[in-house]
Structures are given as structure tokens and as C-alpha cells.
Amino acid sequence: KLKRSLKVDAVLGIILLGVVALLTNGTLPAGEIQNVDAQEIIYGFKTVEFTENAKFDIQISPFSSGVNTILVKVSDFENNPIYDSNQIKVKIANPSKNISPIEIPMQIIKDNNNIPVEFQGELTFGFSGEWQLEIESQRTENANESKILNVLVKPRLENIQTQIVEYEFPEKAKPLYPLYDGNNAIWISDPSAPRLWEFSLDTQEFSSYSFNGLSTMFLTMDNTGKIWFTDSPRNQIGYIDLETKEITTKTIPKLGPVISDNKPIFIQADFDGNIWISIVNKNKILKYLPDDDVFKVVELPERDSFPFALSIDSDGNIWYTATGTGKFGKIDPNEGKITQYSKEIPLEGPEFLLFDKNEDVWIAEHTGTAITKFNPVLETFENISVPDEEALPFGMTFDRYGNIWFAQHVVDSIGVYDPDNNNLKEIPIPTEGSFTQFMTSDKNGKIWFVEQEGNKIGTVNMIEIPVDISQIKTIDDVEMKYTEIASPLIALGIIFTALFYVKSIYDKRRLNSLINS
């Protein structure tokens, strides 16, 4: 009996070793798993919507511009057919483009007394963007059930063909920060000289405007169309009147401790035309009221905060990054109240921030090689790591599809992240040693970036590639994943290990019993 028991133990041991070998050799390294996940593109849109008395199961494939197939199941909340309904109306519209609702012909493809009625139709999204979808279940004995939802149709990053076009400055400069003025021109600061550059999007020509100072660093536009700038070495701010092209400057008062000079860095206009300036070395943010010619001081709550970037939300609050403490916060412009936010582990070099259409805050962690999304309502963080550990992500902006683009400072490529599909991609910059730090978007959502060492301004031309339906993978495709194999095997391994342990105790006692007898 003992001999037979040992044989069984040996066989089970070999099986367990085989399972361990399978799990070990079948696992990709952590980085490779992330790469595979990032490269996997799944097409399609699927949602469940409810009305007062009905449930709509909606699927759209491939969910891209062009021809799509829509499937709709209509049922009650228990997934039973609605007894007095066997017709459905589907309409699509695009109010932003003045496209009125267009009815989509729908046909019944499944009609059984025991399952919900399923309808199918063919709809065409003429272009990417936000579309309005209206679905109405027509009933004979009750009021119709209808649902309206907005759907964002956009290409995946792999379906966007990009081409970078560069324009060289007419003379040697150190272009830093670009700003779109809303009138088909990009304005660029120049830390190497007291001047502002204007780049015409119509003619692709440069113009420069000089003033009495030392440099221009960061730019903002107020509600009257003036473009303001910081001149850090001269401790002043200024603005250019876009009609007359005249530049006016204003000296910033000395701030304590006066043993060191002020270092004004970032600048941001609010909705009332006031100008906010971060003083990076004095732990202060200034509010300048042009009408009263008065500076007000906002003292940050922690020493060595090193306030850097500024931005404004839809309520008019001024947000800032505190590079020294790894935090960020907002200032109520009326009450002056400061609210600070931080992760359990402080952010690494937060040096730029901006808001998306949902009022989420995006923060570039300059030394943390990541961009981080912060939800101000839930106060939650989502971290997106960039592929290159040397990248130093910096300035950010959004394209017409809602993708977030970010500069990578010391790497000759710019990054783009699709927050709707959780996909990230890098676009190489042709110029070597470009040193790209900041970027902006024009009214068409076209990306523009500045190459400080390349002495160029660049843009990204994007062409949407049609989706080949026959070659795509949809959300309904079934695939055996590694975790689906590994999890049961690991569980079995734990169970068998426990059984081995119990059996070894039992065998030891039995052997002791035999020896003693």
C-alpha cells in the first residue's frame, strides 16, 4: 500500500511541476504584457439603456466613420419580449453640424415568443464626431418607449495616418511656448530675446515684434484679445495689442524675501480679464488687475511649493501645480480660498495641467514619466505611463478627436493618448535634438508644437484611414486569455499542495504506527 501511495504522490508531483512550468514559460514579462494590451484594438460599441418600462440592448459595429451595422434588442426589465411592440424607429443626427435626424431602416432578424425581438439596420456616420442616436420602440397598447443618447465616433490611433510638417524660423531663436490666437495665427515666446513671434497659418510666414526687455517665456490671451507674456529676467509682464502690434510692459513689485529676485514663470488670464502669474521661487501666485493697475498676492500654504503651471476651469477657478511638493491646487478668484490635492505618493514633477471637456484635470508629471488624470468630483487619479523612461512629458493639448497630445522634451517624438479607448502611440519628430516642450491646437483641432533646439514650429497632419470590417476584432469575439487558463490551474495547484501536506502528515503517523508496532 505504501509503495502504491508513493507512486501516486510521484505522479501528482510531476503534474504539479508541469503546471508550474506552463505558468512560468507561458507568461510574458510585465512590459511585454503592457505592450500586447496596448496593441490590441477592439472595435465596436455596446451599451444597455433603460426607459421607464423598457430595456434597449444596443450594439454598433465597427463603430467608426462610414458604414456601420446596428443591432437593437428590446425587452422588459426581466429580459422578456414586450408583448405589444414589434416595430422600432432609429434616427441619427448631428446638431453641431446642423444635420437633422435621419431615419434608419430596421428589420427584424430574431422574433421568438420567448426571447426579446432583435432588430438590425445599417447606419452611416459621415465623419468622426459626436452623434445623436434616438431609438423608439413603437407600442400598440401603451405609450412608445424612446431613448436619446450621444455617441462619440472617432478613429482608433492605429487608423490615423500622421505626417509631421516643420517650418524653420527665419533667424536664430529659442522658441518655447506656442499660443493659438483664434484668428489663424500661432504666437510663440522666445526666451533668447525680448520679442514675440507670429506665425501665420494662412501664409506660413513669420513676423517678430520686439520691446524693451530681456525675454518672453509663457503666454496667455485675455478676454479682449490681448496676448500677455512673462519676461522672467526683467521681472515684468507685458501684452501685445493684436490690432496695433504695440507692446506694453508692467514691472512686478518686489516680493519677500527681497534677498532674491522674483522669478515670474507662468501666466494665465481669467474670465474677468485679470492676469495671474506664478512666482516660482517665492511660494506666491500674483493676481494683476489691469483696470486698477494693482497686484494682489496669494501665498501658498506650504513652503518650497515652487508654483509653476497655471490653468482655469469652467467655473473660473485658477489651478496651479506645485512642483516642489508634488501637489496641485485651485484658487477661488473671488474669496482667495486655496484647495490643494495630492496622491498618497506625491506626483513627480507636476509641471503642466489642462482640462478636458468633462472638466477632468490632466497633469504632466515631468520627472515621473507619466500623464495623470484627476477627477475633481470623485478626487480619483488615473496614471498613464509613457513608453520612454527618458521622455520628460511636458506641455499638452487636445486634437479634434479628443485625444491628448503631449511633448516629450528630450525625446524626438511626441505622444498621443486616446482616453476613450485606452491606447497610446508615439509620433517621431524628423529633426534630431528638437527639444520639444510645449504645444497648442488651432480651431480645427490641429496640433502645433515648438522645437526649441530645432528652431522650428511643427504641425501634425492627420488622415483618417477607413476601417476594413473584414479584418477587425469586435467586442463579441471570443478569445481564450492567459488568465482564464492560469487562474484555474493556480487554484488547483493550491488545493493539491494542501492535500499533499495533509497526506504527508497522515503517512508520517502511519509509518510511526507501523514502526512502533
Identify the function of each model-found stretch.
Residues 170-182, 212-223, 255-271, 302-315, ...:
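Beta-rich, blade/repeat-based domains predominating
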Residues 493-508:
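Alpha-helical transmembrane segments
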